[in-house]
Amino acid sequence: VAVFLFSMATIRKQSIYSSIYIYAGFAIGAFNVLFLFPKFFTPEEFGLTRILMDIALILSMICTAGTLPVALKFFPFYKHYLPKEKNELPTLVFTLGLIMCTLLYFSFPYIEPIALKKFSSRSPILANHLRLVLPLTISLVALSMLEVFAWIIGKTILANFLKEFMFRIVVLLVILAWVLGMINDYTIFIELYAYLYFIPVVVLAWVLMRSQSFHLVFKKSKVTHKFSGMMARFGGAYFLGNILNVIAKTNDTIIIASQSAGGLADAAIFTIATYLITVMDVPQRSMVSAATPQIAQAWKDKDLAKLDRLYKKTALNLLVIASGILGVVILNIPAFVHVLGPNYE
């Protein structure tokens, strides 16, 4: 019981701090999405930032190939049976990510013409900048993998700070540079935007290297030999589930941009609604990052009672918080329409 209470206290503490950074980041993101982008960019220019990100999210999920949940679930086994100098799980994860990103890079010239046929007529600005999906995807893959290993060593607060808060601050600075005339060419703006995720990638990579918690190991261990089949099945199941989840969240924007008469302008309007929905997802994101290592350890120890308590307590907390956020959003819909203007009504 004492161990469980300590685990819940750790999860609660990390969730609170993570939620603070995530909500602060969302406040800045809301200022960017609900005010700055609609006011200082055309709907097509705003829509381009959203559609590039949505395409990159789908491709990055493909490139991670289900390795992230595998790393989280099976790292306790590697930690228990191997010293960190012989733990090759991080090497396996990053190597597979590198291979998938390399395949995407070399196959993109063959994929691009197919995509251009879909978007060129209704979203010509996307056709001119579709190649920027590559740096966005690669940086998202790198950040996702680094984030998982930051969670494993307990640096969930730092990972959430970099991904949710720091990134949006940098986006705000780039937008302000556009507003102040320091950037006067939209091509330069969108080029900068596509590379912004590399900033938290570099910072988080440096922190993990300084921690000396992981090493590059190219020798197959007995743990990998024992669990490789189970890891492949587990990763494959999660991969298919996550792909469907990401597509469900992003395909509507892509379809609107390719089929709607307004193209990216209509996609920008739809983005406002989807952004408000993601606000309700914040508590879940912060709690997952804090609870997942604890859940993985409980699975490894076969502590079903702890798993039962963790799932029930986190689910109850998330239900209460999300219900409150939904109520606030519904009550403020008229205010959102008033601020955004008639184009977004």
Regions found by a protein language model. Give the residues of each.
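Membrane-interface junctions at transmembrane-helix termini in multi-pass inner-membrane proteins
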Residues: I11-R12, F74, S139-L162
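Interfacial transmembrane-helix starts/ends
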Residues: R12, R50, P83-L98, A232, ...
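Hydrophobic alpha-helical transmembrane segments
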Residues: R131, F161-A177, G181-Q212, T274
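Signature of the first transmembrane helix
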Residues: T10-V70, C101, Y105-P109, L136, ...
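Interhelical loop/hinge segments that connect adjacent transmembrane helices in multipass membrane
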Residues: V3-I11, R122-I125, G181-A194, L204-K249, ...
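Helix-loop junctions and terminal segments of transmembrane helices
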Residues: A65-H80, I152, A273-A315
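Interfacial/gating helices of multi-pass transporter permease domains
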Residues: L36-I58, Y186-E191, K226-F234, Y238, ...
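Interfacial segments at transmembrane-helix termini and the short loops linking adjacent helices
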Residues: E44, E112-V133, V329-E345
